[in-house]
Amino acid sequence: TRIIPPPREKPENHLLPQKRLDKTRVLIYHSHTSESYLPVSGKTHLHNGRGDVVRVGESLATKLREVYNIQTLHCETIHDHYPFRDAYKRSEQTVKQLLTENPEVEVVLDIHRDATPGLDHKVKIKGKTAAKLILVVGSERMGLQHPHWEKNYSFAKSLLEIMDRLYPNLAHGVILAEARYNQHLHPQSIIIEFGDDKSTWEEVSYSIQLFSEVLASYLNLNSTGYSM
């Protein structure tokens, strides 16, 4: 089934969701809260603290709320303090609690930034440079129970299709990983990486603007009314 976004002449109006503002539709959190951008903070990580990715999450949440009236919950809890290997275990507990408190959430996003050597994360879109995105979907290949992974994968591919129609080349694509990355907790849960450790804030901020429209388009077309 092809997903065709609505006309784009008036994004402020045609992307307004039909749900009440007080219903939380999007949950944003960070398993690797310390991740940062060298041009922004001078560091790749703000260890035991809130790195630049938290600013990304808050900026995206603000766009969704203020531009598209999509009620969004942004969690700033630090998850990757020592020992760092337990970051996903900690964020799993956070997400479980937040979904219990907000069972109507339709989309769960774990916001990161990439650091793959040699991968170009810059793309020109309408004359401005944006930081490219990567969508990461977990699976059950490591043997852990993950009943939703195919739904997560379908969700990511739907976002990518809208993205490619609205803003071609904004994303590198969808990566299907072996670990489940807490995505077993919700059928529309993915990781999104905004740029890499060398991205500037201007590039990342532009990507946030573009992606917020993509996500709003998806939600407007696919109102699920989840109750976990």
Predicted regions and their residues:
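Catalytic-core regions of hydrolytic enzymes
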Residues: D22, L46-K122
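Non-catalytic propeptide/linker segments at domain boundaries
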Residues: T1-L27, Y37-P39
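Structured segments of extracytoplasmic/periplasmic soluble domains
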Residues: S31-E35, S59, K63-Q71, Q97-V105, ...
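Second-shell loop/turn segments in exported
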Residues: H14, V40-V53, T77-Y88, V95, ...
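Catalytic cores of processing enzymes, dominated by hydrolases/peptidases
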Residues: S91-L98, V105-D110, A115-I191, G195-D196
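Active-site-adjacent mobile loop/cap segments within catalytic or ligand-binding domains
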Residues: A171-M228
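Short loop/turn segments at strand-loop or loop-helix junctions that form parts
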Residues: Y29-S34, E76-T77, G138, G195
